[in-house]
Amino acid sequence: MSSEAKCPFNHAAGGGTTNRDWWPKQLRLDLLSQHSSKSDPLDGSFNYAEAFKTLDLAAVKKDLAALMTDSQDWWPADFGHYGPLFIRMAWHSAGTYRIGDGRGGAGRGQQRFAPLNSWPDNVSLDKARRLLWPIKQKYGQKISWADLLILTGNVALETMGFKTFGFAGGRPDTWEPDQDVYWGNEKTWLGGDVRYGKGAAGNEEDGGVIVADVEKHGEEVSRDDNGRILENPLGAVQMGLIYVNPEGPDGNPDPLAAAHDIRETFARMAMNDEETVALIAGGHTFGKTHGAGPADNVGPEPESAELEEQGLGWKNSYGSGKGADTITSGLEVTWTTTPTKWSNNFFENLFKYEWELTKSPAGANQWVAKGADETIPHAHDPSKKQRPTMLTTDLSLRFDPAYEKISRRFLENPDQLADAFARAWFKLTHRDMGPRARYLGPEVPAEELIWQDPIPAVNHPLVDEQDIASLKQKILASGLSVSQLVSTAWASASTFRGSDKRGGANGARIRLAPQKDWAVNQPEQLSKVLKTLEGIQSEFNGAQSGGKKVSLADLIVLAGSAGIEQAAKSAGHQVTVPFAPGRMDASQDQTDVESVGALEPVADGFRNYVRSDIKVPPEALLIDKAQLLTLTAPEMTVLIGGLRALNVGTGQNPQGAFTDKPETLTNDFFRNLLDMGTEWKPTSPARHAFEGRDAKTGSVKWTGSRVDLVFGSHAQLRALSEVYASEDGKEKFVRDFVAAWVKVMNLDRFDLA
């Protein structure tokens, strides 16, 4: 036998020391190639929205209702009803959402995958999803896991006597874990040292792409009593929690200190005080927590469990390991006398008793009603009763002055609690779905809600091809430059976030507060452009018969198209930028200024803009922006080259304008960046700006940013840049730029096929 045949086989594909191990600061271009057809088992022709429309929703709900009380021996239902478990499952699916970047949430069924499937706060939810498998199996691809998790939460509430606000389907599944979500930089579960330290260095260490600054630009930051500030945009106080530690900050049973954490984390999920109180009280009207014994009885989470466990985790060696012996959070609390029926008993108990600190059987801090009778049922033994118990975070609703005022109103007005909880639950579970245009099914509520960023429905004939050609001529004759036209269209459309489907050009909110005043949008120039376009709009609409109109939202995008066509013509290319009318103009009354404010970019590498107080490298924030815009690496690359050629930037900043033919759609950015006759030097120790000097004469030829130079520095981006810098790449560059541009302009056009 040869020595080669005897050689042991000790590795498999993907093993060994990786590029990431060698170069941990390497840019994460892989974030732009997630969720491709290569990971999707469904045919390319599969359309989830169309499949959902064929679903018998009533039949699914009937099956779910039957499941609620069909207790299984392998995981018995508390109080004979799975409703509380499924409410927690749905809540924790949706509750990862944060308004800062729109990431997290229920929209892609990510609770099935790491890390969420193994978070400490999601103990036992593996069993909840496994209980649902027969129903998912029955209806197949007509209902996604993402939709099923939320629908099940609704049915759970309804079977326990609560009237929900509605349900919308339309959440297609993904088939792999999201890699772009920055969950924090702690290395241990339930750690919080980094998010409450100076903040992580963002991608400098962990390769994430999100802004990790703890200070909010130009705003008063929210500090707790110890001066702590939670790192942006995180929505949880510890790694692996959905929101807060129910025992109190770092386990300290202080209801007032806990109230600060509650207010901060719920606000980052776009909830106000009333919604927060309603959600906590409404959710804690049902079920119980689980802490029957010490946590050291609980085995590894699903991602660390042995193969034979088949995706289940947290195997419990305490007693039977289930039912009355269940260990989940380590807390052992049941709030109400009717834990499987809607009531106002949570608030009745909260205010009726004085509360004394005690320990759960697992040793966790919790509270018991002082001198109370044993009125609370046992989850698995009808012969037993217990005293009312509460979490530290429950007591926050009584002892925080603002929460207490709301709580007493709900105590005295149960109908107000029911309405507030129904609305807050709907918002919680639908916040990341985007506009109502994406909502599917017979239970979509008719009421339009401000947090949905409403846009009027089209109520007039749209412009035709002849109108479009005429409007382009008027735009180009208006005196506005190519740069101004393209910059404004980009500013309008590039607010879109693929994470929560918010933003975009539809609605023309760029003309409204707060967008019209954002520094990145150059308010003075923006005002001039909008005034000119509004004049063209007014003249056109006034000359029409039959009610035909062009919206400003459409006209802004059309103006960008006209600018690009003119720039391409100047470069010797005849192109027509595809344009689909149908956008409408939102009003200021339809715009929640604070909520829309979350869309303001801290950086936009496409415009060479970065806020001065941001410490994450601008090139990493470019990847962040591109990922939110659902761009691939080639699309990002060609857009950078085209926008630089068209002189799209902020202010009079010449960075990245590597051309002597500005506002002409050439590949000069790539050709000049890759020119070996240029030597680049940083202009300051911060290394944010660079000068490109002639290698022979030393004279300054260009100035560039980190975002510009990364396209020559990063091996993959350089490879892409070479394609567009090549002699045979000029037409491809124009063609690909137009395609990527149209993609961005239409990202929020959910009405288009």
Curated annotation (Swiss-Prot):
List the InterPro entries.
Catalase_peroxidase, Haem_peroxidase, Haem_peroxidase_sf, Peroxidases_AS, Peroxidases_heam-ligand_BS
| Gene3D superfamilies (UniProt xref) | 1.10.520.10, Peroxidase, domain 2 (1.10.420.10)
Q: What is its EC number?
A: 1.11.1.21
Keywords, comma-separated and alphabetical: Heme, Hydrogen peroxide, Iron, Metal-binding, Oxidoreductase, Peroxidase
Q: Which residues form a coiled coil?
A: none
**Where, by residue number, is the active site?**
H92 (proton acceptor)
This entry carries the following GO cellular component terms, namely:
cytosol
Q: Where is this cross-link: Tryptophyl-tyrosyl-methioninium (Tyr-Met) (with W-91)?
A: Y243-M269
A Pfam family for this UniProt protein? peroxidase
Tell me the cofactors it needs: heme b
Its EC top class is: oxidoreductase
Query: Binding positions for heme b?
Result: H284
PTM statement from Swiss-Prot or TrEMBL: Formation of the three residue Trp-Tyr-Met cross-link is important for the catalase, but not the peroxidase activity of the enzyme.
Task of the protein: Bifunctional enzyme with both catalase and broad-spectrum peroxidase activity.
- Family in the record: Belongs to the peroxidase family. Peroxidase/catalase subfamily.
Name of the protein described by the UniProt record: Catalase-peroxidase
Q: Which organism is it from?
A: Paraburkholderia phytofirmans (strain DSM 17436 / LMG 22146 / PsJN) (Burkholderia phytofirmans)
Q: Which gene encodes it?
A: katG
